[in-house]
Amino acid sequence: MVYIPPGPFLFGTNKKDVAAEALSLGIPKPWYADETPQKKVFLKEFYIDRYEVTYKRYKKYIDGLGAVPPSNWQGANFPEGKDNEPVTHVSWYDAANFCQWAKKKLPPEKLWERAAKGKEGFEYPWGNTFQGKLANLSDRPGSKNQPVEVGSFPKSASPEGVHDLIGNVWEWVDNDYGPYKGSTYQSKY
C-alpha cells in the first residue's frame, strides 16, 4: 500500500481538445469533455495499492471464498503464465467484493485521480508531457495490445510510487461514471 498525504488537489481539468485529437482516434467524445470544470478539493490522507490486482492475488480470493472465477479462466485456474499480470474480465461487483474480502475498498474517482496526478496535479503520472513509451498502451511500438506484468513500466509510476495508472488495463472506482457537476458535456450513459 502507498500512503497518499492529505492536502488540496485540483480535480479534473480546464483543458479542451481543441485539435479534436480524440475524435480523430475514433473516440466518440473530445478529450476532457466530461472532466470539466476543474475544482480545488481537499482530500484526507488515504492508502492505495501500489500495483493492479494480479491473477495470482485474485486467485487467493477465488479459492478463499469459492467465488465465481472470471470468464477467461479454466475452472478455478487463471490463464497460464499470467501470475503477475493484472486480472481481467472482472465486473465492478467482482472488484468491490474482492476489495471487501481484502479488507479494502475501491477508491472514489477523486482519490484515484489524486494518486495518478500526484500533489502537483500532473496531467500524467510522470509529468505534463505525454510520453507513450512510458506505459503499456495499445498504440505503443511493439505493443501486442495485451496486458503485461504489473510494474513493467516503472518510469510511469506516480510521484508517490503507484504503478500502472495509465495503460495496461482499466481500473474500477467506487462511483458511477458521469460528467462532473457543472460540466456542459451531455453523456449518453
How should these model regions be labeled?
Residues Q38-K40, D49, P159-G161:
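Short, surface-exposed beta-strand/loop micro-motifs that present aromatic residues
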